[in-house]
Amino acid sequence: MSLSDHGRKLHICVDFLLPRISPNISVSLRSIEIDMLGHYYSYLDQMRHLTNDWLIIPGHDWPYFGGGVRAVDLIEHHDKRLDLLRGAAANGPITTAGAMHALFTFDLTDHELFFASCEARAHLNHLVARNEMQIQTEDGIEYFYPG
């Protein structure tokens, strides 16, 4: 959820349009199949039209101007992440764990591991929603194939 005041050109974005980092876009463990990244792309598509005179108030860091530019940066960031997964799946089917290794090339703490797995799955779900990947379950493990 975010709030906008068009008269004052003020947008309170909570964690969705942070100035320095990409927010964690994750699936819910209760609804693992939902395309959360698709929802986020829709939000960013709306925000990319903000002019530079809008004041953005995030839930972390400091207020800033340039929310439209930041939205485009975040779209490009997630596009690159999707490209990494397309490349990983080109060599054979990948699991959510395989997607995590493609997206996060550094050692993860236990806390980071949870968020990384949910974010990796959100990116895989988006590729499925775009019909760029298919899911096949074998022995209780979900594999993601190009297609």
For the regions a protein language model found, what residue spans apply to each?
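Metallo-beta-lactamase
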Residues: 1-82
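C-terminal regulatory/interaction regions
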Residues: 84-147
